[in-house]
């Protein structure tokens, strides 16, 4: 593994300040009446790693910038540790921020880049040296302090940007898509390093990304946004297994959840070509919600569709594309006129044109309202 801080012993840990945040009915409306963030409500506990995730234009970065003080809050209240921050300037909010672009000074050494903000605050040189050396040790940058950014790799430059934030010893760390400029392999490494950094600093972090994999692998809780509105807040496992609506179900998870439109008919979910028996617990919830004989959307994840040797009770499927990813196949298949993605182990070989048998694990299925797209529970 490239140099990093994953192996630094616990003796280098340094607990920073506490910070609890409360966002109450936050709104952002621009002069042209574009409503970017709508009634955003969230309580963030001290030491949480919160990830805002959603597609471009969902309001996640705007919300982060309002927390930082870089965007004015149109309505609502931002409270940090019991103090309203709406009118507090950015420099006085005790917040450190890491941006997508590293924004390093090319003519300065790594040490001077990390120390620059502290020098502007007129921190004592001895304190600056202590903080920079501490951060450099954590981030695996001790051997690079005299180099300039042009002599560093992309991952090393991102670490310098992280180090510049760490030395401020702020109560809250904000990160706005910090890994977007890195290649795929380096993103995986840096994900692990940032998670480890959170454990070492033991402080509050808020991270923005459009990448659901980053959200799932790093967050204590995920905040999923669409069109400026929070869709769901929860732990990664919760939002994956219990999505609040079809948007969350389709956004979280790769490949996305499969959806089939149909109706509830007695004990079955039915379409023109499919008839699937619903487990008792799920059926009880569907009936209690009043969906008997009504249109619904059936959802099932690719890994919950089983490929089996034909036994007569399997559902016939025809493979249109077979993608081998190494340990598994992603099979794009047609099932009764419905296009589905199936995750299958690479024990067997698959190819386009194959006729296969599948079964749905109905204990893992989801149902959604056909109009509102809200989960039926």
How does the language model describe each region?
Residues 244-296, 306-318, 333-350:
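ATPase nucleotide-binding modules
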Residues 53-55:
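The feature captures the beta-strand-to-loop junction immediately N-terminal to the Walker
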Residues 76-84:
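Conserved ABC transporter NBD signature motif
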Residues 74-77, 127, 227, 365:
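Conserved coupling/switch loops of ABC nucleotide-binding domains, chiefly the family-specific signature
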Residues 68:
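Helix-to-loop junction immediately C-terminal to a conserved catalytic motif
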Residues 90-247:
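ABC ATPase nucleotide-binding domains
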């Amino acid at each position: 593994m490239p140099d990093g801080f994953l192996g630094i012993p616990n003796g280098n840990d340094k607990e920073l300040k506490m910070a609890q945040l409360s966002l109450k009915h936050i709104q952002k409306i621009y002069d042209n009446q574009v409503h970017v963030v709508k009634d955003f409500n969230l309580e963030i506990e001290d030491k949480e790693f919160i990830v805002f995730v959603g597609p471009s234009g969902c309001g996640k970065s705007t919300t982060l910038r309002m927390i930082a003080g870089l965007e004015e809050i149109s309505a609502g209240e931002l409270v940090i540790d019991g103090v309203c921050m709406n009118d507090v300037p950015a420099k006085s909010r005790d917040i450190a921020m890491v941006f997508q672009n590293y924004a390093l000074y090319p003519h300065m050494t790594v040490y001077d880049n990390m120390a620059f903000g502290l020098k502007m605050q007129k921190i004592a040189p001895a304190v600056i040296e202590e903080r920079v050396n501490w951060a450099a040790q954590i981030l695996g940058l001790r051997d690079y302090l005299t180099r300039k950014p042009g002599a560093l790799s992309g991952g090393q430059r991102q670490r310098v940007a992280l180090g510049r934030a760490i030395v401020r010893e702020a109560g809250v760390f904000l990160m706005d898509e910090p890994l977007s400029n890195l290649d795929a392999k380096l993103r995986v490494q840096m994900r692990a390093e940032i998670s480890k950094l959170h454990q070492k600093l033991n402080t509050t972090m808020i991270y923005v990304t459009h990448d659901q994999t980053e959200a799932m692998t790093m967050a204590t809780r995920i905040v999923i946004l669409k069109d400026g509105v929070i869709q769901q807040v929860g732990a990664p496992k919760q939002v994956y297994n219990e999505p609040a609506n079809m948007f969350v179900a389709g956004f979280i998870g790769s490949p996305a959840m499969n959806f089939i439109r149909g109706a509830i008919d007695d004990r079955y979910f039915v379409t023109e070509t499919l008839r699937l028996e619903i487990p008792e617990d799920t059926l009880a919830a569907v009936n209690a919600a009043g969906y008997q004989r009504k249109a619904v959307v059936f959802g099932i994840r690719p890994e919950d569709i089983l490929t089996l040797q034909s036994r007569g009770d399997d559902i016939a499927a025809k493979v249109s594309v077979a993608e081998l990813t190494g340990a598994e196949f992603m099979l794009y298949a047609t099932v009764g006129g419905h296009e589905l993605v199936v995750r299958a182990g690479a024990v067997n070989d698959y190819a386009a044109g194959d006729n296969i048998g599948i079964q749905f694990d109905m204990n893992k299925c989801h149902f959604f309202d056909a109009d509102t797209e809200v989960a039926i529970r």
